[in-house]
C-alpha cells in the first residue's frame, strides 16, 4: 500500500501468480505474461468525499505527493486515508517532519469536519474510523479476488504487508479475512525497491499469429521459436 493505490498478489510455494493477460489503466488489456497483481485505488493519499447520493467514498482520486494529505502540511485541502490515520494517532508527526504539529492537526480536523463529519452527522474520530473501514473493505475484497476467486483460502496464507502505508492496515485485514499471521519487513517503504534489486531477471518473448489452425505452417512456427531462442541468449 503506497500513496495512491494498493497492489495485491498471491504467492504459493514461493512462486507468485502469473497472468498471461492483465488490464492496465482505462481497462486496456495487455497480453504479456506478468505477475498477477490487482490494483485498487486505496492508498495513503486516496481522497475521502461524500458523493451525490450522500454516501462516503474513498478513492480512487488521490492527493498525490504534492500537495499530498492535509497532515503533510503542504497545503492539501482534501481529507485522505493518511489524514484519518493521523487523527487517530497512528502516524508519528515527527516521522512526517511536521514543524507546526498543532496547527496542522487543527487544519486536518477542520477540513475533515467540513467535508465529511458535518454531512454525515458524525464527530471527526467517527469519520476517520469510517474512512479507514471503507478503505480496509476495498483492500480485503482485493485479497479475496486474488485468492478465493482462484480456489485458494486466505486462511491458509500469511499476509506480507509492505509499502509506506501497508502495515497500519495489516492487522485489520488479517482479522477480517481470518489470516493467521502478518509479516512486516523492517523497512516496509523500501521493500518494492529492494525487490527490484534482488529479483531474478526474466524475459518473455511472444508474437501473435492471426491464422487458423488449418493454415498453420510448422516451418514458420519453428522459425519464430528459433528467433525467440536467439533473442533470449543474445
Task: Provide a role label for each language-model segment.
Residues 2-234:
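N-terminally biased helix-coil "hinge/interface" segments that flank
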Amino acid at each position: 500500500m503506497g500513496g495512491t493505490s494498493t497492489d495485491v498478489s498471491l504467492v504459493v510455494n514461493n512462486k507468485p501468480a502469473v497472468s498471461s493477460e492483465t488490464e492496465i489503466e482505462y481497462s486496456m488489456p495487455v497480453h504479456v505474461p506478468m505477475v498477477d497483481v490487482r490494483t485498487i485505488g486505496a492508498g495513503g493519499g486516496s481522497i475521502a468525499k461524500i458523493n451525490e447520493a450522500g454516501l462516503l467514498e474513498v478513492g480512487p482520486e488521490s492527493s498525490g505527493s504534492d500537495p499530498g494529505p492535509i497532515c503533510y502540511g503542504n497545503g492539501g485541502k482534501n481529507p485522505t486515508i493518511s489524514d484519518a490515520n493521523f487523527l487517530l494517532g497512528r502516524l508519528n508527526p515527527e516521522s512526517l517532519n511536521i514543524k507546526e504539529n498543532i496547527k496542522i492537526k487543527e487544519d486536518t480536523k477542520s477540513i475533515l469536519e467540513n467535508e465529511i463529519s458535518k454531512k454525515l452527522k458524525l464527530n471527526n474520530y467517527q469519520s476517520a474510523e469510517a474512512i479507514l473501514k471503507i478503505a480496509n473493505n476495498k483492500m480485503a475484497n482485493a485479497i479475496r479476488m486474488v485468492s478465493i476467486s482462484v480456489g485458494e483460502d486466505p486462511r491458509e496464507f500469511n499476509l506480507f504487508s509492505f509499502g509506506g502505508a501497508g502495515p497500519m492496515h495489516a492487522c485489520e485485514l488479517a482479522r477480517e479475512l481470518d489470516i493467521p499471521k502478518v509479516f512486516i519487513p523492517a523497512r516496509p517503504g523500501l521493500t518494492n525497491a529492494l525487490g527490484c534489486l534482488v529479483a531474478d531477471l526474466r524475459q518473455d518473448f511472444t508474437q501473435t499469429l492471426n491464422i487458423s489452425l488449418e493454415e498453420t505452417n510448422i516451418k514458420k512456427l519453428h522459425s519464430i521459436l528459433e528467433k525467440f531462442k536467439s533473442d533470449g541468449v543474445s
